């Protein structure tokens, strides 16, 4: 993996994580209490984000190898799937909390792999969102 691939992978996976979490949070806030519907929403954003990030990367510099766009798209798809994993088993408070925990862990892994520390502010926002959503669900 080249340094450029690593950059695309980090950018794409973090974008996927946050995009999917945003859609899931919106669905929960709108009162969706079905694991299947949350998965459908997460799948929709995963497909849209993957196409958008991959195409955007390719079109931003067509003189470069399409490999960059493929790495970006694959990483975005992978990142988008992580927050949705708990809802495969259904819907409930534990799935909402697991969604937040997996997203935080994913962000930490991405940041750690790159050698950066995820700022406390980002993690505090994600944690607050997770706790807030679980309280709303209860």
Give the positions of each predicted feature.
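Hydrophobic, small-residue-rich transmembrane alpha-helices and their short perimembrane loops
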Residues: 1-103, 120, 124-138
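Transmembrane alpha-helical segments of integral membrane proteins
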Residues: 97-115
